[in-house]
A protein has these predicted regions:
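Alpha4 helix (beta4-alpha4-beta5 surface) of REC/receiver domains from two-component response regulators
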Residues: 65, 86-102
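Conserved acidic segment of CheY-like receiver
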Residues: 2-16, 20-22, 33, 52-53
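C-terminal output/effector regions of signal-responsive regulators
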Residues: 128, 132-154
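Receiver (REC) domain active-site loop signature in two-component systems and cognate sites
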Residues: 58
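Helix N-cap/capping motif at the beta->alpha junctions
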Residues: 33-42, 63
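Conserved phosphotransfer cores of two-component systems
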Residues: 45-47, 70-76, 97-98
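C-terminal output helix
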Residues: 89, 108-117, 121
Length: 154
């Protein structure tokens, strides 16, 4: 069986954060980086991304605004918000508007973030498997309904 891809999109306007993240995690995952929400949307349109990690405070569009803006077009990726600022209102917005899986404070602990990312990939995988099983159930249910109608008509 083919291993599932482990693609992460990390968005941060600070290049040194992107470089450090990629250096820390590239041996475990395929990392795509973007310096803006616009670049992030472009990568999402081109690549199969399972995890989106974004900084909250960026020029032009906050992390929460970005995550909320992509929900309709990209509903499946698991979302993680990184921020250097604790703000209750942002946490609430992140959960309610951005459907954030985890809210993590900077500076992050590499080992803890890796565990969070691994858990996020597990959640993604389980959701994907559930979706496929539901499609299979619907197909089988439709077949059974058809067979029942055929039997009732004969």
């Amino acid at each position: 069986m083919e291993a599932s891809p482990k693609n992460i999109l990390y968005i941060d306007d600070e290049v040194h954060n992107l470089t450090a993240f990629k250096a820390n995690f590239r041996r475990y995952y395929t990392i795509f980086t973007a310096e803006s929400a616009f670049e992030g949307k472009k990568i999402l349109a081109e690549k199969n991304i399972q995890i989106i990690i974004t900084d909250q405070r960026m020029p032009g569009m906050t992390g929460v605004e970005f995550l909320a803006s992509i929900i309709n077009d990209f509903p499946d990726p698991i979302r993680i918000l990184l921020t250097g600022y604790a703000d209750t209102e942002t946490v609430i917005e992140a959960i309610n508007k951005g459907q954030v899986y985890r809210y993590i404070m900077k500076p992050f602990n590499e080992a803890e973030l890796k565990i969070t990312i691994d858990n996020a990939f597990e959640v993604y995988s389980l959701r994907d498997e559930n979706k496929k099983l539901m499609e299979k159930v619907l197909t089988i249910n439709n077949q059974l309904e058809f067979m029942l109608r055929q039997r009732l008509l004969s």
